[in-house]
Amino acid sequence: MSKIWSKDETLWSFALYGTAVGAGTLFLPIQLGSAGAIVLFITALVAWPLTYWPHKALCQFILSSKTSAGEGITGAVTHYYGKKIGSIITALYFIAFFVVVLIYAVAITNSLTEQLAKHIQIDIRIRMTVSFGVVLILNMIFLMGRHATLRVMGFLVFPLIAYFLFLSLYLIGSWQPSLLTGQMSFDSHTLHQVWISIPVMVFAFSHTPIISTFAIDRRENFGEQAMGKCKKIMKVAYLIICLSVLFFVFSCLLSIPPAYIEDARNEGVTILSALSMMPNAPAWLSISGIIVAVVAMSKSFLGTYFGVIEGATEMVRTTLQQVGVKKSRAFNRALSIMLVSGITFIICCINPNAISMIYAISGPLIAMILFIMPTLSTYLIPALKPYRTVGNFITLVVGLLCVSVMFFG
């Protein structure tokens, strides 16, 4: 049995599952519920291939590069395209995930102010106080150190997944098929909704940062066989991810009237808030919903924040060097944390719509790195020509459609 499936492969499957299923899962039903049943069914059909193909392509891109053992995406880009384009891709990578950090911080603030609004009047001073508290507490957890923070995040993965599964099963008793069958019209508006839903799907199923670590680990352990090992794990992990996420999405949308989903979308909160808005929602659901939403988004925030701060530190170092100033890494890192935290606080106070940020900025930028860069490279780099497949071509087209939302959506 060990030859068929090892303990190590099981652990990596859990790692991929834990990073893919989280805060993004809470936003997907909001967009799909607003878009209509046709878009939901199309998403269900394409979820697995459009999760597997792009992440597989990124693995191929990393593993095919002739870089030193510990280098991931950045090293592969530099190997194929040189330092200048490598710096541009690194900057895009930083911006894409900095926006993810902002989305989670805004959504956490909104979830907390939504609960406070039941007891007190929310004005700009209250929002600023909550925003400051959110940024401060998340930074305090972050400053505990990578090891301690990752241990806390790892501990939270299974309770969160168990809650999603429990809630999906619990809501079966409230299913109303008419909520979906009443939205089955297909027209030009439906096509538009399919188009603008692509970035939210990309955002919800993407877990780009861990792919670099995953590919490096497989290469260190299996050498030339690394890609085969990656595909073996990814096929199984992504099937489980897609089935569980889609079960959660369908269960929510079969239970929640569209009006509540639209209210949650406008307020920039998650599907758990939409559930708690319903007049017949039990007290335990309202309480657990806000706790789980905040914990899930905090986990995802911190998981992304490490990479954002590392990227910001490098950008600060480079900028200071260009003006003739050389500071220690500790100084550059501290300045980066202050700058990122300050911008995050301001954005939380401004309160842009979370879904709009996903389909206008974050989703398209992630698509550039995950969908377009590795697949387009198979047409630009002769060494990657063997990886040209129908799946990679479809991934490239979907990536271009996703990016087009940023400019025309």
Each predicted region: which residue ranges?
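Membrane-interface loop-to-helix entry segments
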Residues: 108, 112, 128, 132-174, ...
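Selective recognition of specific alpha-helical transmembrane segments in multi-pass small-molecule
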Residues: 45-55, 101, 160-170, 232-259, ...
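Hydrophobic, membrane-embedded alpha-helices of multi-pass small-molecule transporters
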Residues: 7-30, 93, 97, 167-177, ...
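Extracellular loop-to-transmembrane helix junctions
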Residues: 7, 29-63, 67, 85
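Hydrophobic alpha-helical segments and their helix-loop junctions in multi-pass secondary transporters
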Residues: 105, 139-142, 158-186, 202-208, ...
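TM-loop-TM module centered on a large, flexible mid-protein loop between adjacent transmembrane helices
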Residues: 70-83, 241-297
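Hydrophobic transmembrane alpha-helices that form the core helical bundles
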Residues: 54-62, 70-120, 290-315
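Membrane-interface "cap" regions at the ends of multi-pass membrane proteins
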Residues: 1-33, 51-56, 392-403
